[in-house]
């Protein structure tokens, strides 16, 4: 049996570091062979890792060593918040590239949860630093973010058919594709706006009673939220939207993926705090610009952004570990492990 109690990143797949720690108890007369030589990292990196893992209450007694030399010291940078952290990373990357000391592809930025990539991506875009995301989607390409942005666009542009067709069944309302097409055909044939058609959908005989009722409820939600656009703050509007459609509960499927989607939506809520003065129209315009810049393909010479899980087994000349704070890294769940 081969295992390492110092690594346990796949607990959601059933992995548990205690399986290795308890192996001698479960199987008597076991011979333990410690593999302590590290062939990849320098001594400074191993020392930093060892100083952290030594704080584990439950762990095996082993000391990693290497013949790779001392290496450059691990640098610890303390900043005010995640925005300052992202800008510090971008500046270091750009300075090294400008000095022709490194290429963009030499750098990797690691984070614990996918939601953390948003502020890093925006910093990269602001400063014109090429980047790519490995093992995941760019923040504004994630389904849950696209869903909420579609709702916001529909509040601002009541006749945005593309956004309407995206959100009409999100969360699930039991309105099928055929019903949506019948509704749109009826709306266009009668020369109505989408909101007027939703308000008068009871007159659409082509639809079932259930579909008419569900579309009418959606119309009520959109109308009431649209009335808030000029009366509340952008974060307040988004909060009202999430509560009216019960979106967070819709995402809560009791899986790590569901939790990640919820974290992404919470991150979007935090984004709106930075655009309160712009209003909904200004916010949507800014997000469109970011999304356009976000879609550029930079090829291989780009900074790599990825989660710690996705980075397993990979090597980079320069690595930034972000979000080293309680409840993020270590994650809030780690306190119960």
Outline where the language-model segments fall.
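Conserved helicase NTPase motor core
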Residues: 1-22, 35-41, 241
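A residue-level signal for conserved active-site and pocket-lining positions in enzyme catalytic cores
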Residues: 2, 45, 89, 109, ...
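Short alpha-helix plus adjacent loop in nuclease-associated cores
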Residues: 6-13, 40-41, 133-156, 168
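Switch/connector loops and helix/strand junctions flanking conserved nucleotide-binding motifs
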Residues: 8-11, 41-47, 54-55, 61-62, ...
């Amino acid at each position: 049996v081969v295992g390492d109690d110092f690594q346990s990143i796949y607990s959601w797949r059933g992995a548990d570091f205690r399986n290795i720690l308890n192996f001698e108890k479960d199987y008597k007369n076991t011979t333990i062979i410690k593999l302590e030589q590290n062939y990849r990292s320098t001594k400074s990196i191993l020392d930093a890792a060892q100083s952290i893992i030594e704080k584990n209450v439950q762990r095996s007694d082993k000391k990693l060593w290497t013949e790779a030399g001392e290496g450059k010291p691990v640098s610890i940078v303390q900043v005010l918040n995640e925005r300052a952290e992202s800008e510090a990373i971008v500046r270091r990357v750009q300075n090294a590239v400008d000095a022709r000391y490194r290429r963009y592809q030499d750098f990797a930025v690691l984070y614990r949860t996918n939601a953390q990539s948003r502020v890093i991506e925006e910093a990269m875009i602001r400063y014109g630093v090429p980047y790519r995301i490995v093992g995941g989607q760019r923040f504004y390409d994630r389904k849950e973010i696209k869903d909420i942005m579609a709702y916001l666009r529909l509040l601002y542009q009541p006749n945005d058919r593309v956004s309407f067709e995206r959100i009409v069944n999100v969360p699930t309302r039991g309105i099928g594709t055929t019903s949506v097409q019948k509704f749109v055909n009826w709306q266009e044939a009668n020369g109505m706006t989408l909101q007027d058609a939703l308000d008068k959908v009871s007159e659409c005989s082509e639809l079932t009673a259930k579909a008419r009722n569900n579309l009418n409820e959606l119309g009520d939600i959109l109308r009431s939220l649209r009335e808030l656009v000029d009366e509340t703050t952008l974060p307040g509007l988004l909060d009202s939207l999430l509560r009216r459609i019960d979106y967070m509960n819709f995402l809560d499927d009791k899986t790590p993926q569901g939790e990640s989607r919820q974290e992404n939506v919470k991150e979007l809520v935090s984004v709106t705090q930075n655009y309160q003065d712009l209003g909904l129209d200004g916010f949507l315009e800014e997000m469109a610009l970011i999304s356009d810049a976000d879609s550029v393909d930079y090829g291989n010479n780009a900074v790599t952004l990825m989660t710690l899980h996705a980075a397993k087994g990979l090597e980079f000349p320069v690595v930034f570990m972000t979000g080293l704070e309680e409840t993020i890294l270590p994650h809030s769940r780690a306190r119960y492990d």
